C-alpha cells in the first residue's frame, strides 16, 4: 500500500455454485490489493451468456460471497455486458479477470481509459486443474448422479 492509500481490486463473475476454483480466484485477487469488491452477474446476464438461468438468484450468490473472508463488498451487476458506469463508480485500481473469462485485457483497459479511468487489468492464472473447479462440470456430475 502506497502511503495511506488503499488499493481497490474489482472482480466480476457468476459465482453460481461456489467451488474451490472460485475461492482460489478470490484469494489471488485479494492479494493484489487491500480491498476486494466482487461484481456478481445479474440473472439476465447469466441467462444471456450461459444460455440458461442461474441455479441461484443474484441476491443469494451475493450473500454467499459476502461471507467469504477475502471479499470486502459485493454488488450485483446490471443486465448486459460489463457496465463501465458501475466500474467508474467503484473506482478500482485493479481489475482481475479469471482465467476462463472471455474478456481481452487490452481492450478492457482501452475502454476504461476512454472514460477517464487508469486501471490495471490483470488476468489471473488457472491454478486448479480438476473438473471439480468448473461449475458446468459440477452440474453435469449432479445430473449424472441424481438423474440417471
Swiss-Prot record:
- Pfam families in the record: CTP_transf_like (PF01467)
The first-level EC class reads transferase
Catalytic activity entry: FMN + ATP + H(+) = FAD + diphosphate
Q: Where does ATP bind?
A: 14-15, 19-22, 100
Q: Which PANTHER family match?
A: FAD SYNTHASE
Family the UniProt entry places it in: Belongs to the archaeal FAD synthase family.
Its recorded name reads FAD synthase
Record organism: Pyrococcus abyssi (strain GE5 / Orsay)
Question: Could you tell me the gene encoding this protein?
Answer: ribL
